[in-house]
């Protein structure tokens, strides 16, 4: 009888912890990181009435969690620093992105935060694709997600400007895309791929930019 009770108690504990582990291990299938240049957190509340009733901003406010006291003390407040600091959780002195551009005393010239002369443009013949995250010294949320899932996760960065797509996505991103304003197409670099995926090429072929300019 005593052994039977121990067995039942052991099985009960196993089922309890197993159920708890299953609930903890439930993960979202999609995580979206969004940065809006020069948008302070209080704008979400100030302009709440102007957001679409079923739009994304109201959904985030009504169903999300607001970290209003979060602060990363860094300077200068350029976008390269901002993207890197938010997605690495570190400051420029640690992540290496000290501005959109800075003076490199070893190269004796000004360098751009995402420049990389060892890679080539994919998607156009311009030099605007010679970019990568190699100047960034820290890992990003995307990099840590890759490690945590044994590189089964897919991480993609997309932005109008190259630094906005490249730096947040991190070193191990599957892809990063940005806009080439010399040809009106979305491009990448061979740091990520040898050629654009079919869906990007198809989107470029629509020349949607011609509708606005």
Placement of each model-derived feature along the sequence:
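Beta-strand elements within well-structured catalytic alpha/beta cores of enzymes
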Residues: 28-40, 60, 86, 145
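Short, structured active-site-proximal loop/turn typified by the sulfatase FGly-forming signature C/S-X-P-X-R
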Residues: 44-94, 154-158
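Stable alpha-helical elements in mature extracytoplasmic
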Residues: 35, 40, 53-57, 82-83, ...
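Extracytoplasmic/secreted cell-surface and envelope-processing proteins
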Residues: 41-45, 79, 165-169
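His/Asp/Glu-rich, glycine-adjacent segments
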Residues: 91, 96-213
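Acidic/histidine-rich, surface-exposed loop or edge segments in extracytoplasmic proteins
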Residues: 32-43, 121-127
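Bacterial Sec-dependent N-terminal signal peptides
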Residues: 1-26
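Soluble non-cytosolic domains of exported or imported proteins
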Residues: 26, 38, 47-51, 77, ...
């Amino acid at each position: 009888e005593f052994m039977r009770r121990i067995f039942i108690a052991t099985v009960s504990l196993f089922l309890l912890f197993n159920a708890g582990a299953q609930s903890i291990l439930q993960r979202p299938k999609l995580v979206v990181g969004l940065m809006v240049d020069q948008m302070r957190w209080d704008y979400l509340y100030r302009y709440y009435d102007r957001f679409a009733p079923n739009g994304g901003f109201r959904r985030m406010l009504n169903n999300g969690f607001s970290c209003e006291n979060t602060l990363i003390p860094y300077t200068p407040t350029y976008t390269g620093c901002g993207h890197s600091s938010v997605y690495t959780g570190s400051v420029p002195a640690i992540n290496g992105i000290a501005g959109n551009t800075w003076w490199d005393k070893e190269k004796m010239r000004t360098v751009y935060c995402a420049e990389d002369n060892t890679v080539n443009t994919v998607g156009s013949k311009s030099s605007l694709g010679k970019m990568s995250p190699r100047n960034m010294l820290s890992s990003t949320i995307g990099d840590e997600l890759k490690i945590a899932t044994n590189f089964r996760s897919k991480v993609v960065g997309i932005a109008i400007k190259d630094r906005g797509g490249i730096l947040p996505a991190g070193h191990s991103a599957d892809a990063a895309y940005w806009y080439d304003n010399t040809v009106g197409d979305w491009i990448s670099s061979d740091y990520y791929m040898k050629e654009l995926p079919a869906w990007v090429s198809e989107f470029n072929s629509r020349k949607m930019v011609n509708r606005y300019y």
